[in-house]
Amino acid sequence: MPEASSPRRTPQNVPYQDLPHLVNADGQYLFCRYWKPSGTPKALIFVSHGAGEHCGRYDELAHMLKGLDMLVFAHDHVGHGQSEGERMVVSDFQVFVRDVLQHVDTIQKDYPDVPIFLLGHSMGGAISILVAAERPTYFSGMVLISPLVLANPESASTLKVLAAKLLNFVLPNMTLGRIDSSVLSRNKSEVDLYNSDPLVCRAGLKVCFGIQLLNAVARVERAMPRLTLPFLLLQGSADRLCDSKGAYLLMESSRSQDKTLKMYEGAYHVLHRELPEVTNSVLHEVNSWVSHRIAAAGAGCPP
């Protein structure tokens, strides 16, 4: 058999023909997940995961949203999870944004009159913000959990940023260091789950990817004044990956009239996988906020 006729396989060597997937504009195969309600969905919501992880880590959130009669859909971004691409490498951050819009358009064709929402965590929060900014009146609302708005000041000092930009020209694949999983959550069992997840990339942040994250922060800063959609913003005060000051900046800079910030004192980065009292509160806040916005979108009036 010629090699060209061999089925495309995931990085884990599973044929894509056996899995839900889409093919992006670059011809790369992206693994998809769908959580569909039993009846006709009242709304659609795309879930955008963070750097180094995959959309399967949002199963609990997705099932909760599915219980609201939402069709929840997601994919592993290029270079992540079961999608193609060198691990945690992307030619341009816009690729992530473009792929989300492609997936959104594909699903929307089947449900043309159903309101659509975005949910994003960390890097996925930055992606969601940029997606929403590209289509200012398209989405009915957005949920952001610890979004990447400002980089951590410890890792993104002026000197370190300059050094990274210089290194990107000569050693783009040099590893800057791994994500310290202990700063993700105060819940040790959740940290252990992260550390043992075979689909999580723990190879370390390459210079070229770090530069794309810095580019994303700059783009988010420019995009914030264009945001007019309703959004819920959940942030931990002790987040050492995405500076909590970014949450206040987003609240101040966006033009949205319907915007809510809930700050969790002492909480770390992954609020939906934090100590039980935090995670339960996050699920409750998301459930309540989304329920009200679905009703408002269906009635064609503000909440």
Curated annotation (Swiss-Prot):
Q: What is its EC number?
A: 3.1.1.23
Chief location: cytoplasm
Reading the lineage from the top rank, the first entry is: Eukaryota
What membrane topology does this protein have? Peripheral membrane protein
Residue numbers carrying 3'-nitrotyrosine:
58
Q: What's one Pfam family the UniProt record gives for this protein? A: Hydrolase_4
Query: For this protein, what reaction is catalysed?
Result: Hydrolyzes glycerol monoesters of long-chain fatty acids; a 1-acylglycerol + H2O = glycerol + a fatty acid + H(+); a 2-acylglycerol + H2O = glycerol + a fatty acid + H(+); 2-(5Z,8Z,11Z,14Z-eicosatetraenoyl)-glycerol + H2O = glycerol + (5Z,8Z,11Z,14Z)-eicosatetraenoate + H(+)
Q: What other remark does the UniProt record contain for this protein?
A: Short-term inhibition causes analgesia, while long-term inhibition causes tolerance to endocannabinoids acting on brain cannabinoid receptor CNR1, and a reduction in brain cannabinoid receptor CNR1 activity.
**The protein's assembly and partners:** Homodimer.
Protein name in the entry: Monoglyceride lipase
UniProt source species: Mus musculus
